[in-house]
Amino acid sequence: MTLPMIMSCGMYYSVPGLRDLCHDVKSRNDDAFTDAAEWLSRVIDKYDLEGYSVIPIPNHSGRAEYTLDILKRLRRLRSIRICDILVGAAHATQYDAKKAGTRLSLNDYGFELRGDIPFNRAILFDNVIGSGNTYFSAMKTISFKTSLLTLAQTHPTAYYANQWSKFE
């Protein structure tokens, strides 16, 4: 079974409660991690993830923090392999860059792999996909196309597929 480009709980602005959940996750609300894992478990139940490693994408600190916390909660609910091997450079948040009238480039993340991906089968995980830059930068770092598991997306999947074609 081929996985879709994006596996999400829904659209950020239109699914009731999803935007608030994403904000609570970024605030490191412990209950939000559990709720996020429950939402994500319903998404991954639709797919066969056997043999895949789920890689948490680091936040602006350069480390996977809340993304890793959510995946650990998800692993309590579903059998998933977590591979915390992606690190990055500390950088501005997308939100702060947007407020400043700029946009982060793919190079601003400074992602590096610190280990091997078992079977070269990976799924990236991030809280929200907005512009797609974080996802695309992480995908370029691992050197092969991969799906993204995310709580929410701000655009339809076709938008991201079109954006990705510009980087190939």
Task: Indicate where each model-derived feature is located.
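Short histidine/acidic/glycine/proline-rich micro-motifs that form metal-
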Residues: 27, 58-63
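Acidic, divalent-metal-coordinating active-site segment for phosphoryl/phosphodiester hydrolysis
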Residues: 128-138
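Short glycine-rich phosphate-binding loop at a beta-alpha junction
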Residues: 50-60, 122-123
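Active-site-facing substrate-recognition patch
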Residues: 1-52, 87-119, 131, 154-157, ...
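Substrate-recognition/cap helix-loop segment adjacent to the acidic, metal-dependent catalytic center
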Residues: 64-82
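A short, conserved beta-to-alpha structural element at the edge of catalytic cores
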Residues: 96, 136-140, 144-168
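Conserved Lys-Pro-Asp/Glu-containing loop-to-beta segment of HAD-superfamily phosphomonoesterases
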Residues: 120-128
